[in-house]
């Protein structure tokens, strides 16, 4: 193992132990940093002390030429900057060579959501098969509380307060949130808990795979996509789309941006504000369809 690999392994241990980042986030860091290790090795670097701003810029250009999108490149450079900042804090680098290198701005795409009618159709799973009950409970919790995928799979039974209809989740940066989940989610969690012991697990996880282990993020993605097809939805159903739908529907009903920010666990209001654009699109379509002066130029 080269010094390049050794330093990255040390950094990943730091993120896991000191920062307590989720396994999914750690895997993302690992993938991004493996790309720079490969590039550095190809260019004859033996240690990170040999890396300079020119090499980082060349790495960014190479990534773009290989088809990496602007948003993905920004993520890769962010991981690299964080890694170099850590090396500086360990007195192994004098300065961060990635500090002044930025990716081109990515066009901001509005997140797609599932409308209320399609959401009701998706949630209309009335099968008494244990795995179907588990899936219905996961869908209800994710849409009912606007959880991230990592937050959903990280739920333990001890995080539930079904009497008050609340759940505790550990979000980004180890920030805990206490969230209402709604009576439908409570009812389906209770139904799932009645069947959960069939899997004979001693795991504390709320949601289990058919092998009795904590369900994986990939398994959740696969099951949600399958239910989208079974329930006749035209659009691909993935977990983050349920979170988008929660945010959009909450804003359409309440208009309370700050409240939705708290529920989603966004550190910055600007992250939540993207959903106001979605809400405006909805209002604009209503206006165009209903207002007598809307049909301009016709």
From Swiss-Prot:
CDD domains: INT_XerDC_C. One of its GO terms (biological process) is resolution of DNA recombination intermediates. One of its GO terms (cellular component) is cytoplasm. One of its GO terms (molecular function) is tyrosine-based site-specific recombinase activity. Residues 109-288 form the Tyr recombinase domain. InterPro entries: CB, DNA_brk_join_enz, Integrase-like_cat_sf, Integrase_catalytic, Integrase_recombinase_N, Integrase_SAM-like_N, Recomb_XerC, Tyrosine_recombinase_XerC/XerD. Its main location: cytoplasm. It is found in: Cytoplasm. During recombination, the heterotetrameric complex catalyzes two consecutive pairs of strand exchanges, implying that specific pairs of active sites are sequentially switched on and off in the recombinase tetramer to ensure that appropriate DNA strands will be exchanged at both reaction steps. FtsK plays a central role in this catalytic state switch that turns recombinase on and off reciprocally. The reciprocal C-terminal interaction between XerC and XerD may also participate in the enzymatic switch process. Keywords: Cell cycle, Cell division, Chromosome partition, Cytoplasm, DNA integration, DNA recombination, DNA-binding. The active site is at residues 148, 172, 240, 243, 266, 275. Residues 2-88 form the Core-binding (CB) domain. PANTHER family: PHAGE INTEGRASE-RELATED, TYROSINE RECOMBINASE XERC. Belongs to the 'phage' integrase family. XerC subfamily. NCBIfam families: PRK00283.1, recomb_XerC. Site-specific tyrosine recombinase, which acts by catalyzing the cutting and rejoining of the recombining DNA molecules. Binds cooperatively to specific DNA consensus sequences that are separated from XerD binding sites by a short central region, forming the heterotetrameric XerC-XerD complex that recombines DNA substrates. The complex is essential to convert dimers of the bacterial chromosome into monomers to permit their segregation at cell division. It also contributes to the segregational stability of plasmids at ColE1 xer (or cer) and pSC101 (or psi) sites. HAMAP family: Recomb_XerC_XerD. Forms a cyclic heterotetrameric complex composed of two molecules of XerC and two molecules of XerD, in which XerC interacts with XerD via its C-terminal region, XerD interacts with XerC via its C-terminal region and so on. This is Tyrosine recombinase XerC. It comes from Escherichia coli (strain K12). The gene is xerC.
